[in-house]
Amino acid sequence: MTILNHTLGFPRVGLRRELKKAQESYWAGNSTREELLAVGRELRARHWEQQKQAGIDLLPVGDFAWYDHVLTTSLLLGNVPARHQNNDGSVDIDTLFRIGRGRAPTGEPAAAAEMTKWFNTNYHYMVPEFVKGQQFKLTWTQLLEEVDEALALGHKVKPVLLGPVTYLWLGKVKGEQFDRLSLLNDILPVYQQVLAELAKRGIEWVQIDEPALVLELPQAWLDAYKPAYDALQGQVKLLLTTYFEGVTPNLDTITALPVQGLHVDLVHGKDDVAELHKRLPSDWLLSAGLINGRNVWRADLTEKYAQIKDIVGKRDLWVASSCSLLHSPIDLSVETRLDAEVKSWFAFALQKCHELALLRDALNSGDTAALAAWSAPIQARRHSTRVHNPAVEKRLAAITAQDSQRANVYEVRAEAQRARFKLPAWPTTTIGSFPQTTEIRTLRLDFKKGNLDANNYRTGIAEHIKQAIVEQERLGLDVLVHGEAERNDMVEYFGEHLDGFVFTQNGWVQSYGSRCVKPPIVIGDVSRPAPITVEWAKYAQSLTDKPVKGMLTGPVTILCWSFPREDVSRETIAKQIALALRDEVADLEAAGIGIIQIDEPALREGLPLRRSDWDAYLQWGVEAFRINAAVAKDDTQIHTHMCYCEFNDIMDSIAALDADVITIETSRSDMELLESFEEFDYPNEIGPGVYDIHSPNVPSVEWIEALLKKAAKRIPAERLWVNPDCGLKTRGWPETRAALANMVQAAQNLRRG
């Protein structure tokens, strides 16, 4: 029983983000479709060869996507919304881009599909749309073409296909409502056809991804798996693939399926290997997801070996990444600025392939010397002073319940704040950022590259802040912001100023489409060596008599949008960040800043996949926010901003944050989101976003007034604020001025009654 290794997928974008550049060039009309397709072919060939050279036995094919793999599956099945269809019924790459972006070099523009998070990762997928009576047919043969490509290059391949039940689970019904699960029998013939085509090509194994099997699914969805896989059996061997959680709760459903193997995530799941071995059919292959596909840490391979060695020789076994390596940067070797000690702790996608080769060889031979050598740096890390800060650990251990409580309840604080700020009814503000112009980005880049000295950089930033204050005063806004000209990214900026974080040069991961992010890495205990935002907030406040908000990114969001440590809990990291930012709140307050906003857009995103695990997460997530904010005096007003499409199921936790003001994204839902706050009888102040900043369209005064009147039917007017949905970083100044002028006018009209 020779053990093989494989990956579940590989990053698509290219080491230098070649795919992003090719996509954006094509969209802008600066290159041809053939030039774009050529970049895709080149990247796929390179990535297969790199994995092979790193020691991978079975190469994934079908993991490449021009925008998103769920969208690729939609096209494969012929699921193209009517508004995006070509007149002749054909499907091409521009069809795909129109669904993803709303427009493409050919075809008519139309509303893009909805985009949402891929399970609990920071990757996004395009939500499939289903209509009653929908027809499906094999339409987009990208998978088959890529299999042919890989076979022609002489590779041993394992095609990757998103499974039918998960695909339906991820979608939404449009128009007349019906049960989307009823479409299962309509899509299965397409899957059968694809598997038959793969069998014709001599394919032995197909990785069929069903990550929905780690969720707490309704019984009807669990029951759908058996008939679905009965229909798919017999043409090739199927590796039923799950990830992001364990499968034990749904193992009875899984073991009844006519598949030949199961992949489990042994990093994020709590499945016991011995128990899995006992319960799986003896002729099934077990693919053990031992190497973390969604973090950047070098694995302790001696631990991984011990985790799996007892079943070696007892069943067919593969070793694999826990999930697709899509969520990891590509290659650590090109990082030239990382400290040597810190660099020795990391493994990016190619290094993870090497780990799988080492693990496979040791399991086949019984010789673990290479595993011990590889694991030495990560074992040494446990005692590094770069990791452990006794002062932080002592402070964290000393936290009491009092540290997460404001001195008085909201009603008392609100009186003190009204007396201090004397704001009018319907107070107007913005969410924080103003347009990041070419001048601002060039200024920051020149400073970063060393082409600009610190004095000239600070003079430039000060000028942009001054301009933002002047603009806001001219517009008549009531509570101002400094505009965040000095900030590149709301998480990266804070990470750069906190001890315990490091940054990469090329650690890009795909977020969606052509958007890539370079998350900070938490390597050790987090602390704040010096004030971060105080200087610029104080400067902005000196330019005006109106209150200027201090702007912080909250602890849970910084955690969720970074690569976290693996040696301590997420709760520990969040609370360390909260303590560091608590000191920032105190310093802002001491500098005369009376309104402080702590953004937590990721609080809901961080929810565990299983609802039964939500309470524990929300408890420490809320506590981290409160630790951050509770140092504020009664007359300091704490704001928070959140952009979710669903609040109902976490309203208790939103209220428990005890922010004085919460601003939320509501314009696209026509204020429907406020229902949650009305039904809950939310006690504090709310700023429902009155226009969508993601669109360049300028809302009319009448439209904003109508939205605010609608809001006032749900929330008492004396507790309502007036603000856009989100920060204005991505907008231009002309539409920003026009939209804010109309927003201020609408508020003034309502004050006059």
UniProtKB/Swiss-Prot annotation:
It holds the Pfam family Meth_synt_1. GO terms for molecular function: 5-methyltetrahydropteroyltriglutamate-homocysteine S-methyltransferase activity; zinc ion binding. CDD domains: CIMS_C_terminal_like (cd03311), CIMS_N_terminal_like (cd03312). Its EC number is 2.1.1.14. It comes from the Bacteria. NCBIfam families: met_syn_B12ind (TIGR01371), PRK05222.1 (NF003556). PANTHER family: 5-METHYLTETRAHYDROPTEROYLTRIGLUTAMATE--HOMOCYSTEINE METHYLTRANSFERASE. This is 5-methyltetrahydropteroyltriglutamate--homocysteine methyltransferase. It comes from Escherichia coli (strain SMS-3-5 / SECEC).
